[in-house]
Amino acid sequence: MNERQKFTRNFSIIAHVDHGKSTLADRLLEIGLVTDKRTQKNQILDSMDIERERGITIKANNASFDYHAKDGNIYHLNLIDTPGHVDFTYEVSRSLAACEGVLLIVDASQGVEAQTLANLYLAMDLDLRIIPVINKIDLPSADIDKCKLMIEESLGLNPEEAIPISAKTGLNVQEVLEAICYLLPPPVGDVDAPLKALIYDSFFDTYMGVVAKVRLYDGRLKKGEMIHMMNIGRQFTVTEVGINRLSMVACEELQAGDVGYVVAGMKKMGDAKTGDTITHANRQTAEDVKGFKDAKPMVFAGLFPINGEDFDALVDAIEKLKLNDSALTFERENSAALGFGFRVGYLGLLHMEIVQERLEREFNLALITTAPSVKFRITTTKDEVIEVDNPSKWPDPILIGKSEEPFVKATIIAPESYVGNIMSLVIEKRGIHLDTVYLSKDKLQLTYELPLAELIFEFYDKLKSYTKGYASLDYEEVGYRDSKLVRMDILVNGEPVDALSSIVHKTKAEERGRVIIEKLKDLIPRHQFMIPLQAAIGSKVVARESISALRKNVTAKCYGGDISRKKKLLEKQKEGKKRMKQIGNVEIPQEAFLSILKTGD
């Protein structure tokens, strides 16, 4: 170990959403970089406006700074920020792979939450040194002793090492920096061995192309060298290396133990895949960096421009966004109701919301998203296995041997008083109870298995309302399970509306169909003829409503007179309406789609 490695510390901060991770990062950087309070934005590492507005971290950012410790040495600290939301677990795993240790934040008033545990397990899998930090001790509801008990019993960590702080006021934050220097191990690596570096994130720069954020495990890297990407097999010439002191600062070379960035004339994000290993083209390392999980989309939805003329702008926007979001997948799709658009794969519902918000905000587009779906698996009667994420591709029921859907293991942490509400919600969502563990005398951890399709359908919102916001949720995939799935079509005046089709569990079809049809009845304006609205599985109608016709009083000009004259006029009107119904196409207003799809119904 050389002198540089001896005084280097690579660390991450992990926490549940809203437990003060970005605020602590601000305080650490304030001490280390001495950022000017007048020009400082809160949440320094949260570079996107959406991140600051929503108070969440989406992209993994990093900052390097020097710290003069009490032992008289100057330590070089690399802080790698991690997201805390369940959708961005892949960002957390790639950031942690670049570290030797983590600060685990626990909110002094709320204690251990679901994502605290999920992120802790990721850190333990990578064998990282964990320092517990109890934040928000300035709150009146803070209970430090209870938190220490939970840290010992629920997390299995040493409560004596827990540092009580207030990131907001800066109280005890200096102690955290001292603990990083004393308790976290320095990076190990041979600077003379062949280059081995992990790409843990990347972003697109208009002038430099793709910039890869890297952690070097072995070797050295400098400008002018030819590098080889081990997973994709491509080679590039390095044009710049450097470190990130909030902004990018070029340097002579990076060496084993360093966290920095590499620019090498890479034009697209596929050239710098997250989790790939960089080595020298002429002197390659024997094996790549292990322990990395690739991100897979779990939720799929159609994305269409409200104004059809904006399609080219959407193509351009989504391709640019893909440059900064390696987890996003998309393919072109055509809908009779909504025109040209894309079928987009997301990591989860929050990821979906953020992508749409970024497209609308950064590229000034008005968009509509169809109801989210998951990837179903079908075994045909000929024993072929196909995966379907779009209702329009659902095969004819005669050809289906069996259908399966993805299940997840959901961990819910909540106060004991809300257990009844949670159980009834999970039963409603076809969940199976696996386990209950007491984290403290009034806080429980409940584990369930339930279909992912039910989880993405208003589950999180309902969980929050059933528990007055006190429950927290985390989930992981557990594979596919047999399920009785059907495609439900919505017919307006006998014509199926493709944008409203969905794949549902047989037992839920009637309930879902009724909700959509009742909404449509309120939203579609009346026509000159009666409009039947139906929810159907194949030829079987499971729910039906009718929109009554507008009626013109054709007998108004008959003053008294013969009743047969009135009958004749009414018959004539009926004939006209019959003809109109055959020719007439029902205009479904855009608002009807927006209203139905926005609620996720």
Swiss-Prot record:
Catalytic activity, EC: 3.6.5.n1
Record-linked PROSITE patterns: G_TR_1 (PS00301), G_TR_2 (PS51722)
Purpose: Required for accurate and efficient protein synthesis under certain stress conditions. May act as a fidelity factor of the translation reaction, by catalyzing a one-codon backward translocation of tRNAs on improperly translocated ribosomes. Back-translocation proceeds from a post-translocation (POST) complex to a pre-translocation (PRE) complex, thus giving elongation factor G a second chance to translocate the tRNAs correctly. Binds to ribosomes in a GTP-dependent manner.
MF GO annotations: GTP binding; GTPase activity; ribosome binding; translation elongation factor activity
Family named by the database record: Belongs to the TRAFAC class translation factor GTPase superfamily. Classic translation factor GTPase family. LepA subfamily.
Gene from which this protein is expressed: lepA
Annotated protein name in UniProt: Elongation factor 4
Pfam families linked: EFG_C, GTP_EFTU, GTP_EFTU_D2, LepA_C
Localization in the cell: Cell inner membrane
PANTHER family the record matches: TRANSLATION FACTOR GUF1 HOMOLOG, CHLOROPLASTIC (PTHR43512:SF4), TRANSLATION FACTOR GUF1-RELATED (PTHR43512)
UniProt topology in membrane: Peripheral membrane protein
Keywords: Cell inner membrane, Cell membrane, GTP-binding, Hydrolase, Membrane, Nucleotide-binding, Protein biosynthesis
GO terms (BP aspect): positive regulation of translation
Residues at which GTP binds: D18, H19, G20, K21, S22, T23, N135, K136, I137, D138
Any one of the GO CC terms: plasma membrane
Catalytic activity as recorded in UniProt: GTP + H2O = GDP + phosphate + H(+)
Record-linked CDD domains: EF4_II (cd03699), EF4_III (cd16260), LepA (cd01890), lepA_C (cd03709)
Chief place of localization: membrane
Domain tr-type G, chain residue ranges per copy: 6-188
Organism of provenance: Leptospira biflexa serovar Patoc (strain Patoc 1 / ATCC 23582 / Paris)
